[in-house]
From Swiss-Prot:
It is found in: Mitochondrion membrane. This is ATP synthase protein 8. Mitochondrial membrane ATP synthase (F(1)F(0) ATP synthase or Complex V) produces ATP from ADP in the presence of a proton gradient across the membrane which is generated by electron transport complexes of the respiratory chain. F-type ATPases consist of two structural domains, F(1) - containing the extramembraneous catalytic core and F(0) - containing the membrane proton channel, linked together by a central stalk and a peripheral stalk. During catalysis, ATP synthesis in the catalytic domain of F(1) is coupled via a rotary mechanism of the central stalk subunits to proton translocation. The gene is ATP8. Belongs to the ATPase protein 8 family. F-type ATPases have 2 components, CF(1) - the catalytic core - and CF(0) - the membrane proton channel. GO terms for molecular function: proton-transporting ATP synthase activity, rotational mechanism.
C-alpha cells in the first residue's frame, strides 16, 4: 500500500493541500460571488 510509505504519504498530503487551496480560491473568487449576486438580486426583486 503506497499510502504507508512516507514519501508517498508526503506527496499525497501536498497534493491534497494544493488541490484544496485551488478549490477554495476558485469558489471564493468566482462561484460564491455569483451566488451572492443572484441571491441579492432575487431578494431585491421580491421586496418590490
Amino acid at each position: 500500500m503506497p499510502q504507508l510509505i512516507p514519501f508517498f504519504f508526503f506527496n499525497q498530503v501536498v497534493f491534497t493541500l494544493i488541490s484544496l487551496s485551488f478549490i477554495f480560491f476558485v469558489f471564493s473568487k468566482y462561484i460564491l460571488p455569483w451566488i451572492v449576486r443572484l441571491y441579492v438580486s432575487r431578494n431585491q426583486y421580491n421586496s418590490l
